[in-house]
């Protein structure tokens, strides 16, 4: 009894940590915004957004159904609370809090599928992993896929724990069919993850009920009919969103089966999942030999999907979230060494701090500051010159050398003249040239008769890491409107030494310095721009 109380206290502490990490401003990957917030910001709030290509291509490869099932409730709640005056940052925090809450479905599944003697060990080890504290609290489709994966295993195990002629077994079959279809519509990789549990539990179920073929047949009929009905419902829901009948998972499969398509997102060695991504996600546990024992069915729950996904050359760590999560659960059941568990927890803490707090954590504050700058209209630069922003006039915001900015957080009206552009791969010379070209197309002088003053209507903004311009002569013609000091960027170490990125950390919001003589804008380009040309 005392031991259970101790475990419960530790688990409560880990839950508090999970909720705390969910409220951070870290930015793990652009897809956590592109494939969720960008969709609902346009759909529910009427804000101007740049929809991701998966939803705008002629053959869409993403279904909106999983998003509607898992995320729509919290977005509707936010809209009901704030009415027409919604602020993007509270929406972000509420949604991450909601993701944290629904991640408890994984904890519930672990509690029910793990044997009693290893239940606390598995639950605590998983809860201490950085996947639970970071990835599962962010709005990734991979996180939603992981929830559906564990629910699938839960219903399969429940179906095996009761006779098939019991009424409750029909409910398990019904829920299993729905969850499986929703998981597949979330990501087609879901099929790779559920092959092993379906085979394992189906064989066990058949052996237990071999003398009841009618019950087996009835459950199969229920499973097939409910699955078919769910598929039709998903297709109809996608039709309402896209305006045409589309089978998104089929388009997704065709797209990802072509190497030339995958090459646009980056090609990796087919060994990346095994030798890089799984070790990254699982830390020191990956080196425990007993967890690789292929004679145990639990090993195949993670080994088979990793092998299948390794056949595709585009490989990212988040693609393995379900496999890595079940690997951690299995570790909690089999690993007895406290030293190995301690090393894993220390490793998880470091990764949780990095991904949950530090990683690209200046991007979201930078976007919010851009929103404030535009809404304030009158801004004083560090050189004490006044700039005037008119949201009704064309304004271009360039995001350079940072993750694709979550532009939904600008909360622009649907027909706003404020445009955004992400130019990650531009060189410094190309970026500065592009900036000035746009600036001289858009900048104007505005007379303010009430104040009897003349100010510049600034139009073009540049948001980028300050390290990229710190040692550049190009900086002399730019003025910084705002500085976000806390930003960890390890993606530009190929261009700048890591020490320089650390020393000159942070993100700056820049615009052109005042270039005027006698209240008129000169048509002469800055010297540095002429050198670019």
Swiss-Prot record:
It is a multi-pass membrane protein. The keyword Endoplasmic reticulum applies. InterPro entries: GPI_mannosylTrfase. The keyword Cytoplasm does not apply. GO terms for cellular component: endoplasmic reticulum; endoplasmic reticulum membrane. Its EC number is 2.4.1.-. GO terms for biological process: GPI anchor biosynthetic process. Glycans are attached at residues 261, 378, 419, 425, 452, 477, 518. It is found in: Endoplasmic reticulum membrane. Pathway: Glycolipid biosynthesis; glycosylphosphatidylinositol-anchor biosynthesis. The chain crosses the membrane at residues 8-28, 61-81, 91-111, 144-164, 175-195, 216-236, 274-294, 297-317, 319-335, 338-358. One of its GO terms (molecular function) is alpha-1,2-mannosyltransferase activity. It is an enzyme of class 2 (transferase). Keywords: Endoplasmic reticulum, Glycoprotein, Glycosyltransferase, GPI-anchor biosynthesis, Membrane, Transferase, Transmembrane, Transmembrane helix. PANTHER family: GLYCOSYLTRANSFERASE, GPI MANNOSYLTRANSFERASE 4. Alpha-1,2-mannosyltransferase involved in glycosylphosphatidylinositol-anchor biosynthesis. Transfers a fourth mannose to trimannosyl-GPIs during GPI precursor assembly. The presence of a fourth mannose in GPI is essential in fungi. Belongs to the glycosyltransferase 22 family. PIGZ subfamily. This is GPI mannosyltransferase 4. It comes from Schizosaccharomyces pombe (strain 972 / ATCC 24843).
């Amino acid at each position: 009894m005392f031991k259970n109380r101790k475990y419960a206290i530790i688990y409560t502490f880990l839950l508090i940590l999970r909720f705390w990490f969910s409220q951070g401003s870290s930015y793990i990957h652009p897809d956590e915004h592109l494939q969720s917030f960008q969709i609902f910001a346009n759909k529910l709030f009427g804000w101007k957004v740049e929809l991701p290509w998966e939803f705008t291509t002629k053959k869409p490869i993403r279904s909106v159904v999983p998003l509607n099932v898992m995320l729509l409730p919290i977005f509707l709640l936010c809209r009901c609370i704030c009415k027409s005056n919604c602020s993007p940052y509270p929406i972000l925090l509420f949604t991450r809090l909601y993701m944290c809450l629904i991640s408890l479905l994984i904890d519930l599944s672990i509690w029910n599928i793990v044997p009693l003697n290893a239940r606390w060990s598995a639950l605590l080890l998983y809860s201490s992993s950085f996947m639970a504290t970071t990835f599962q609290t962010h709005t990734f489709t991979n996180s939603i896929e992981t929830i559906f994966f564990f629910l699938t295993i839960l219903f399969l195990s429940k179906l095996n724990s009761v006779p098939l002629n019991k009424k409750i077994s029909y409910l398990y079959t019904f829920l299993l069919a729905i969850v499986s279809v929703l998981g597949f519509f979330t990501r087609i990789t879901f099929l790779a993850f559920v092959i092993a549990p379906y085979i394992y539990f189906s064989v066990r179920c058949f052996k237990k009920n071999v003398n009841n073929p009618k019950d087996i047949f009835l459950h199969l009929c229920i499973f097939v009919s409910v699955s078919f009905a769910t598929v039709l419902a998903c297709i109809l829901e996608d039709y309402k969103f896209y305006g045409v009948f589309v089978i998104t998972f089929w388009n997704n499969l065709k797209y990802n089966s072509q190497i030339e398509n995958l090459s646009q997102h980056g090609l990796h060695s087919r060994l990346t999942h095994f030798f890089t991504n799984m070790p990254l996600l699982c830390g020191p546990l990956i080196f425990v030999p007993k967890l690789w024992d292929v004679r145990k069915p639990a090993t195949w729950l993670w080994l088979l999907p990793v092998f299948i996904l390794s056949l595709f050359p585009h490989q990212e760590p988040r693609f393995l979230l379900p496999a890595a999560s079940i690997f951690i659960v299995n570790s909690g059941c089999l690993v007895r060494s406290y030293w190995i568990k301690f090393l894993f927890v220390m490793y998880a803490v470091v990764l949780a701090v990095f991904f949950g707090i530090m990683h690209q954590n200046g991007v979201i504050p930078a976007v919010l500051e851009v929103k404030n700058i535009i809404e304030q209209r009158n801004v004083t630069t560090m050189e004490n010159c006044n700039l005037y922003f008119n949201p009704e006039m064309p304004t271009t915001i360039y995001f350079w050398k940072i993750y694709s900015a979550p532009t939904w957080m600008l909360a622009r009206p649907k027909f706003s003249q404020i445009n955004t552009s992400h130019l990650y791969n531009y060189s410094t010379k190309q970026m500065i040239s592009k900036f000035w070209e746009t600036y001289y197309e858009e900048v104007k002088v505005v007379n303010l008769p009430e104040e009897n003053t003349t100010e510049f209507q600034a139009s073009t903004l540049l948001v980028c890491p300050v390290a990229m311009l710190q040692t550049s002569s190009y900086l002399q013609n730019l003025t910084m409107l705002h500085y976000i000091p806390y930003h960890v960027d390890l993606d530009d170490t190929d261009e700048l030494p890591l020490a320089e990125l650390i020393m000159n950390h942070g993100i700056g919001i820049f615009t052109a310095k005042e270039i005027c003589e006698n209240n008129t804008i000169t048509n002469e380009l800055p010297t540095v721009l002429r050198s670019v040309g």
